[in-house]
Amino acid sequence: MSSVNANGGYTKPQKYVPGPGDPELPPQLSEFKDKTSDEILKEMNRMPFFMTKLDETDGAGGENVELEALKALAYEGEPHEIAENFKKQGNELYKAKRFKDARELYSKGLAVECEDKSINESLYANRAACELELKNYRRCIEDCSKALTINPKNVKCYYRTSKAFFQLNKLEEAKSAATFANQRIDPENKSILNMLSVIDRKEQELKAKEEKQQREAQERENKKIMLESAMTLRNITNIKTHSPVELLNEGKIRLEDPMDFESQLIYPALIMYPTQDEFDFVGEVSELTTVQELVDLVLEGPQERFKKEGKENFTPKKVLVFMETKAGGLIKAGKKLTFHDILKKESPDVPLFDNALKIYIVPKVESEGWISKWDKQKALERRSV
């Protein structure tokens, strides 16, 4: 220990060196001799000076006398002195980034209800700073408002109000608070100027984003109008069914040039093999494609399924192609015709189904039997009303 000598001078602290028969620890620490490190830390945490978390017991469930004494001291003095003390303690905790604890002390200071307006202003303003750090933006705004009621020229509160509104995506309110502080209170305040700059950048970003969305929406609308015009020009109708094939989601009817209704129409195509209960899907088929070209595409090539027994008639020369009419019947599609030629005819009226071409490929030898079983009423029932 350090001490003052007989002449009033300072004596340098001496290191404790145990002599023969002396305890290994100095007398001040002898009570910790037989305790583990965890037990020592727990014991020290009950001492206010070393306390890192609140422990209101004496270790055995009793009262922590030292802590209770400190609590009593906190409320000694005049109301403004007590409130000021809470404010100072809160400020220390705020500096240590212990925002929740600091907020609690500021709240205790306000609960004193002292009559010193400047202290109450600081307590509200400082608690607002804690709420801002804790992302409780609406509470921050409320406390700033209370502080500004006391002192309408508190620039920090305008800044915190602006920042809180900004975080809530309320740019108009954020800009209003910062602009008022800049124009009416402190034109040179760097925090306010920076906040105005941040708001301006955000406004520009949102404006650019909105303009882009409007352009894209207008472009989609223009493309939609062009596509509808192209289909009307070609006398094409579309019929929706109750249960569209999911694969149709992978294709979409479109114009080769989206902004030219006279350019080629491109269709997705559903190719049905009704006698086999199978189907194919082709994502894009030009309206200038002939029926024969589409048949060649799906039947020629190394398709093992058409080489199996019972499927030997699925070759381009041994099949017929049928398409469903608007009335629910069938037509035989000439293989030399383009789909443009077929779809534009007023009679028979062959529509698209779910915005896709739909053709039936049937072996010639099985075609009569399949046609005889075609049920017009069931075909109509498959469609949406």
From Swiss-Prot:
What is this protein for, i.e. what is its function? Co-chaperone that binds to the molecular chaperones Hsp90 (HSC82 and HSP82) and Hsp70 (SSA1). Stimulates SSA1 ATPase activity, but not Hsp90 ATPase activity. Involved in only a subset of Hsp90 functions.
Q: Does the keyword Repeat apply?
A: yes
The effect of E324G is:
In CNS1-3; temperature-sensitive defect impairing Hsp90-dependent function
Q: Name one GO molecular function term.
A: Hsp70 protein binding
In the UniProt annotation, what is the result of changing L330S? In CNS1-3; temperature-sensitive defect impairing Hsp90-dependent function
Q: Where is this region: Disordered?
A: 1-37
SUPFAM superfamilies this protein is in? TPR-like
Q: What is this protein called?
A: Hsp70/Hsp90 co-chaperone CNS1
Which lineage ranks, top first, belong to the organism behind this chain? Answer: Eukaryota, Fungi, Dikarya, Ascomycota, Saccharomycotina
Q: What induces it?
A: Not induced by heat shock.
Q: What Pfam families does this protein map onto?
A: TPR_1 (PF00515), Wheel (PF18972)
Record's keyword terms, sorted: Chaperone, Cytoplasm, Repeat, TPR repeat
